[in-house]
Amino acid sequence: MRQPAVANPVIKESQFEGWVPEQFGQWKTISQSGVVLPPPDTLSDRLYDNLITQVYAAPGLPAVMLLLAYNNAQDGVLQVHRPEVCYPVGGFELSATREMDIQVGSKTIPANFFTATSPNRIEQVAYFTRLGRAYPRSWAEQRIAVMQANLEGDIPDGIMMRVSVLSADAGRAEDQLQDFSRAFITAAPAPLRRVLLGTAT
């Protein structure tokens, strides 16, 4: 059995940023601030090749905060930070995480949803992670995805797409974040869509 090798090249930061649409459908970029970021640590420079934050607005809807975190090589040490780590570090208390799905055409993306609460902010959060061909919903599934790819001879790439809104209404926010995610992925240029979905389409 051959040693696992990196299956995907590094994507230049400027190239990755250029793939992220500033406007699609009714949504338009208004800011890059206000997004809860992964905590800094000794691995920060190695955790992500690309870390993008944007805030999108649409008429009559709460603004959506977007975070994309990508690394071309996810091994047993360097794995995408899950939001359940980032938010408590920022002083938030979290609800239980529940499963949700994001439907993009014929593809169903397994995702997670939770509520993050701080003294001055209630944020509804949805996210998914892709590692190689897998969409792990938990740390355990994430580790299994890395091991399975390694057994196939690959060190997989990994991305997390996280979207959130400031709202006390979890049900309405979940619907909005599903709709936003579907529209964003559909509108993304082919290279970004391939990174998000792990396919050439």
Regions found by a protein language model. Give the residues of each.
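Short, well-structured alpha-helical interface segments that form or flank functional binding sites
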Residues: 51, 156, 179
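Short, solvent-exposed recognition patches
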Residues: 31-149
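Surface-exposed amphipathic alpha-helical segments
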Residues: 159-201
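Glycine-rich, often proline-containing surface loops adjacent to acidic residues and nearby aromatics
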Residues: 63-65, 156-163
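Alpha-helical transmembrane signal-anchor/signal-peptide segments
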Residues: 3-23
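Accessory, solvent-exposed terminal regions and/or long lumenal/extracellular loops of proteins
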Residues: 150-156
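Sec/Tat-exported extracytoplasmic proteins
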Residues: 24, 28-31, 60, 155, ...
